[in-house]
Amino acid sequence: VDSTETFTQRAFLPPFANYQLDIAYDEMFTPEGQPRPNYQYLHQLLLELPATELRQRQHAADITFLNQGITFTVYGGSDGTERIFPYDLLPRIITSDEWATIEKGLTQRIIALNLFLKDIYHEAHILNDKIVPKALVYSCRYFRREMMGLRVPNDIYVSIAGIDLIRLSDGQFVVLEDNLRVPSGVSYMLANRQVMKHVFPRLFSRYDIRPIDHYGQALLATLRSLAPPNCTDPTIALLTPGVFNSAYFEHTFLARQMGIELVEGRDLLIHNNIVYMRTTGGLKRVDVIYRRIDDDFVDPLAFRPDSTLGVAGLLNAYRCGNVSLANAIGTGIADDKALYAYVPAIIRYYLKEDPILQNVETYLLTDKSQRNYVLEHLGELVVKAVGESGGYGMLIGPHSTQEQREQFRKRILVEPRNYIAQPTLSFSRAPCFLDGQVEPRHVDLRPYILYGKQVTIVPGGLTRVALRRGSLVVNSSQGGGSKDTWILYD
């Protein structure tokens, strides 16, 4: 009996009538069509519950998101408006053993990337030893010469990271992308959990799930650890671009969770290289800034002169050691998509260890032979712009038109440094409740890593879902959604 027949006999009853297995790893089912142990209760519950009840719960979740203002902004759309962040009712369930590997691998990776940043802005041993090409680092638009020789608190450049993982068909998690500048989405992870507890308490109480509610306090402790020398009780502020930013909900959410001030650039001023915040009681010194603004915009005197989002003189205050920034300026070189290809070598160089989490095979288009191969196989590969995020600047070969491939061919030939290519991967699919049916959709996972006095990884992360059938793009700006991620206790 083939796996499809077995699957049909045992599990293909409504609401699974449209559920089909393929070569991708399925989070709920084995290749033979059996529910995996961690999904057995959820599978049974879905067989028992009427579709009307599931629809009611999904509607209740949507209303909760709307009432709480849990939205994001899509730029450039026809409406250009705020939308509810699409939420799928069915949780993603990860075993404790799987999580233990993820946690170790992410800890190893964030430590190595911080050592790399410290090195390239000081002695540059890794460049002189030709492990990473100098040209790659110095040509990166996120490499900041202003950071050369500057010490940062505890030598930690990246205090807050979101690292994107996918699960391949063999069941292994691999790293797809490092987000080390201004990672976003953690508020949706926290909101998803609260909504799930509210709309599906029976399911939630049946599983032994590790909590994530302490993220806000863990983030606050991380920011406090960055206080300048001799500052025992730092004043911390979250610097937001303002209400029109797509992640503004997250900025307000996190500031509230931590009990810190939410400020815009116009609320801050610099005097004698010290940062002050305007308050109703007068000026108050600020010691640590959690910035949700990219390097280019933080200081119009140092970077983009047209920026109205930052604070004039902030870089000088930072260089004088009077204020700490999370993340440090210049971390973007470490999440450049071309530099990504060297992270396994970076881990081996600094830690003398093999990577616990593997990379995806990556073609560097500055290499002539690799470039020629990619140009001949554009219809099979994924091409990414090295400095873009959010699913922009990307060509998914199998889903592209001849015209799109020609556009990318021209761009690559003009600026090969600005692009990388990777195989089109069949990453895992998880069950989603869509239009009264349970169907599989591709998912990734973004765990959030904090690096203060130690590395802290809240057990879970944001599982993003490509809600369009067949789509591999999980970004909310491109029609993706999210679901609650459960890490089980042993």
Question: Which residues are covered by each model-predicted region?
Answer:
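Preference for protein termini
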Residues: 1-490
